């Protein structure tokens, strides 16, 4: 045991791939954690600790083979929780991507000769289940059912009519609203990290943006903020948890009879609303803080087809 400990100690300090997977995770954490957002590391760490290390922990990095990866994948594919439900295809893909990222690191920086993940097929799927969203009529029925709680009502009004992310909503202060120009500045995001309220940078550089809000929403927020005399300019308006929003979503759906969707689906609902009105992918992307190519890819089935118009235009051009 003493000789084995010395071997592991020397491997981890020299950065050789004769170390165990568990020891390499300490090296990986030290080198990756400073380079990514804190909540991204927490998500990554959760998957590593719960889904990856229990299987690979005592194996040596240079001895892990593609067949080991396949056996690990099969365990996760066959997993069922206490209700008999499997992991979703998108979660399986996320776990697989984390293992791939782990092995890409020593392959790139520590000359790991064989990357076992690159030789296997990926499990899961990058495409989630069918996109679900509310029409305007469904949202109005829902919002009427939660009007008795002004904090929840105004939170959902902003989510549906602006399409901002949940974390962006929870970080909003009254200073972010310019009620004279009816504009809202998105410059930060809220996360609860290890039980601590934390304000972080938005998800991507594109996420920093100023968006115009409809006049009715501007007036709703003007009236609401006037009532909230407890707030200072830089206090968070919506001092609530994500659980509170989910609970209010459930309550409103049960009271109104509207189908249940996720909080994030309100963002999809906003995008589909703008597509139906006739706005372009580029204009929508600027509003919601996405790349226009992402909007085109994710919502392509919602955009009206121009194929007939193209064919007719080509016919007329040929006949000239």
PLM features: residue spans?
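Conserved tyrosine-mediated DNA breakage-rejoining catalytic core shared by Y-recombinases
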Residues: 122, 171-223, 235
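N-terminal helical hairpins
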Residues: 1-19, 34-35
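C-terminal catalytic core of tyrosine-transesterase DNA break-rejoin enzymes
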Residues: 90, 108, 151, 157, ...
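DNA/chromatin major-groove-contacting recognition/catalytic segments
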Residues: 116, 141-145, 195-201, 301-320
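Basic, Lys/Arg- and aromatic-enriched nucleic-acid-binding interface segment
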Residues: 85-89, 93-95, 108-172, 179-180, ...
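Active-site/catalytic core of tyrosine-dependent DNA strand-transfer enzymes
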Residues: 136-140, 189-192, 214-259
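Catalytic-site neighborhood detector that most strongly recognizes the C-terminal catalytic loop/helix
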Residues: 133, 190, 218, 243, ...
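N-terminal core-binding DNA-recognition domain of tyrosine site-specific recombinases/integrases
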Residues: 30-113, 128, 150, 239-243, ...
């Amino acid at each position: 045991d003493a000789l084995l400990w010395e071997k592991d100690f020397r491997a981890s300090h020299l950065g050789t791939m004769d170390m165990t997977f568990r020891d390499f995770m300490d090296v990986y954490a030290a080198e990756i954690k400073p380079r990514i957002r804190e909540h991204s590391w927490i998500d990554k760490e959760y998957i590593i600790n719960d889904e990856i290390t229990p299987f690979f922990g005592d194996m040596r990095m240079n001895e892990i083979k593609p067949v080991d990866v396949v056996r690990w994948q099969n365990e996760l594919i066959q997993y069922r929780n206490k209700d008999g439900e499997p992991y979703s295809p998108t979660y399986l893909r996320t776990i697989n991507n984390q293992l791939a990222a782990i092995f890409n690191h020593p392959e790139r920086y520590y000359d790991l000769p064989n990357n076992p993940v690159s030789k296997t097929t990926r499990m899961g799927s990058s495409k989630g289940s069918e996109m679900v969203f509310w029409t305007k009529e469904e949202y109005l029925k829902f919002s009427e059912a939660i009007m008795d709680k002004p904090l929840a009502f105004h939170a959902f009004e902003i989510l549906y009519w602006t399409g901002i992310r949940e974390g962006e909503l929870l970080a909003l202060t009254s200073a972010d609203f310019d009620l004279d120009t009816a504009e809202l500045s998105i410059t930060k995001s809220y996360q609860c990290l290890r039980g601590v309220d934390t304000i972080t940078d938005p998800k991507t550089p594109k996420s920093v943006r100023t968006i115009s809000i409809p006049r009715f929403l501007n007036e709703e927020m003007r009236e609401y903020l006037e009532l909230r005399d407890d707030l200072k300019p830089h206090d968070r308006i919506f001092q609530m948890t994500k659980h509170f929003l989910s609970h209010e979503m459930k309550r409103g759906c049960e009271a109104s009879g509207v189908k249940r969707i996720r909080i994030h689906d309100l963002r999809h609902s906003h995008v589909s609303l703008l597509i139906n009105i006739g706005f372009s992918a580029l204009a929508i992307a600027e509003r919601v803080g996405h790349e226009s190519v992402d909007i085109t890819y994710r919502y392509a089935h919602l955009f009206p087809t121009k194929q007939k118009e193209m064919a007719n235009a080509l016919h007329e051009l040929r006949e000239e």
